[in-house]
Amino acid sequence: MSDVIRLLPDSIANQIAAGEVIQRPASVVKELLENALDAGASIIRLDVREAGRELIRVTDNGKGMSQSDARMAFERHATSKIASFQDLFSLRTMGFRGEALASIAAVAQVELLTRRAEDELGTRLTINGSEVGEVATVTSPQGCILCVKNLFYNVPARRKFLKSNETEFRHILTEYERVALVNPQVAFSIYHSGELVQDLPPSPLKKRILDVFGKRMEKDLIPIGIKSPITNISGFVGRPDGARKRGALQYFFVNGRFMRHPYFHKAVMAAYEAIIPQGTMPNYFLYFDLEPSQIDVNIHPTKTEIKFSDEQAIFKLIGVVIREALSSSNAVPAIDFDRKELIDIPAYQGPGKNVVRPPVDLDPSYNPFKETGLTEPIRSSRRQSPDMGWNELFKQFEAKRDAEKMAEPPIRSEGLFASTDFTPSAVSATPSTDMLCYVHRGRYLVTTLSRGLALVDFHRAHKRILYDRFMADESRRHIEQQQLLFPELLEFNPSDASAVKAAVDELQSVGFDLSPLGVSSYSLLAAPVQIIDCAADVVRDVIHTTLEDGRSSHEQMLELIATQIAEYQAIPCGKTPTAEEASDLLAELFASNDSTYTPDGKLIVSIIEEADIARRFE
């Protein structure tokens, strides 16, 4: 039998390696931007076409490469960053494995134009699927221009699984922003299909954050800083009142590299505990600077997972620096005691003053135990109140209360739910007043079914009802619009402009009036009358959810808008409904096509079977 183990060709090996390093166009952008930074570039331009499918081009003014280096750069494990294993523990560069360019060249058509400052002419190199094409000497500006065309052209399965252009471009913007935020001294610009999306000049860190995410954040940023033998921490954290339910801006950077660290995120959240509303997230931009020997970045090909030698100490340090920053900036309100009712106590005058005993009236002949005859009845020591007719008033109150009880619907009956097994078809949509309904802890309704007891979360039930009403009104185009007394300014991330515009177009179709004020700013002029008081919050939540989930179709957007409107308009938890409100709510809920779950998938009704109830008393 012949041997079956063989060595794979370099082209196939590179395509396999590319599966780990190059997952989508954003992966290419990340690697090329980091290479430009490692080359010492101070100006970097990123051009993208068709969300990176057709073209990704990075132009920089870095050191450039010689012709031999340009050819060697596309070989696997070829790098200028390390020469020995010990160099891994003193890394200050972004790349070091020598895998990125080889992986990119394996799944795309690559063209490189480069020149060093000391060379008169540069080099032009083309590679198609790991196959080197033309290598020529040409005129070229200093630095590098690296073009990646037709990504995954030779791996159709990978190209087929790419998302929509909007989604892929958002991933590109995310990588671009991460690199820009940690290198404020470098000028960045990004173009999509020839149109300028964002231009970032060199600037201080705070201005770079504002340039990326909008000037609206200026009042939200609180500077932090601490130096210790373990690590130096700097950056900004958000004010508690700027915490968001969705779309919080949360970034960790270590030694100029973006990272994800769930453990450190817990430290941040612990510092904000009890000072931000439950379910919200604070903004933060934390930069760690420590010796490279104290971290290990060689864990994952994307280098976003990093291990620290003393994570527990850094965890505590994060909590200390954030709490100190919040306290010193008055972001956490201090206790202010009212001094009006304080007793005026004179200050102690010192030992030189004689202490005088205050005069006290004393009867030395008084004996509390002396027996005396009772000459008159003992009177109560309590003060006697004049007869104000309280008894008569109480009787009138009881009579009035009895009359009100007679006017109320009976609370016990076998009417509405006696013959139903929790199916909408068996329930009349007409509100019934003949039912058993009990409110538990101001949130849950307890009612009867033929199968047993139903526990209903009335806040969620109201959400389902409002959602159904909105969808029915939208289908009939009966949404009533109301003008805001004062238009409200809404600002979004400039890099999300295209996705925001798509969401705004859908909002316009369901009763919102949003007027553009620039690339990523809008003025909210009108909204559906039901949510006029919280219209701006609804718009923000809809857009942030769209950016996170990538919803784009009309049906998806409509469902999202209806869900957010129902969330804000529903009866808040803790507000007890009246008997009539509870009856109407239950009747309309069970008439719904889906009375079991809210639009976002949360349980509304839990049933305790009759058999389970009987079993408890056995």
UniProtKB/Swiss-Prot annotation:
InterPro entries membership: DNA_mismatch_repair_CS, DNA_mismatch_repair_MutL, DNA_mismatch_S5_2-like, HATPase_C_sf, MutL/Mlh/PMS, MutL/Mlh/Pms-like, MutL_C, MutL_C_dimsub
Example GO molecular function: ATP-dependent DNA damage sensor activity
Gene Ontology BP terms: mismatch repair
Keywords: DNA damage, DNA repair
Cross-referenced PROSITE patterns: DNA_MISMATCH_REPAIR_1 (PS00058)
Domain of life: Bacteria
GO CC field: mismatch repair complex
CDD domains: HATPase_MutL-MLH-PMS-like (cd16926), MutL_Trans (cd00782)
SUPFAM superfamilies (UniProt xref): ATPase domain of HSP90 chaperone/DNA topoisomerase II/histidine kinase, DNA mismatch repair protein MutL, Ribosomal protein S5 domain 2-like
Gene3D superfamilies named among the record's database cross-references: 3.30.230.10, Histidine kinase-like ATPase, C-terminal domain, MutL, C-terminal domain, dimerisation subdomain, MutL, C-terminal domain, regulatory subdomain
Role description: This protein is involved in the repair of mismatches in DNA. It is required for dam-dependent methyl-directed DNA mismatch repair. May act as a 'molecular matchmaker', a protein that promotes the formation of a stable complex between two or more DNA-binding proteins in an ATP-dependent manner without itself being part of a final effector complex.
Similarity remark: Belongs to the DNA mismatch repair MutL/HexB family.
PANTHER family: DNA MISMATCH REPAIR PROTEIN MLH, PMS, MUTL, DNA MISMATCH REPAIR PROTEIN MLH1
Protein name in the entry: DNA mismatch repair protein MutL
Organism: Porphyromonas gingivalis (strain ATCC 33277 / DSM 20709 / CIP 103683 / JCM 12257 / NCTC 11834 / 2561)
Gene that this sequence comes from: mutL
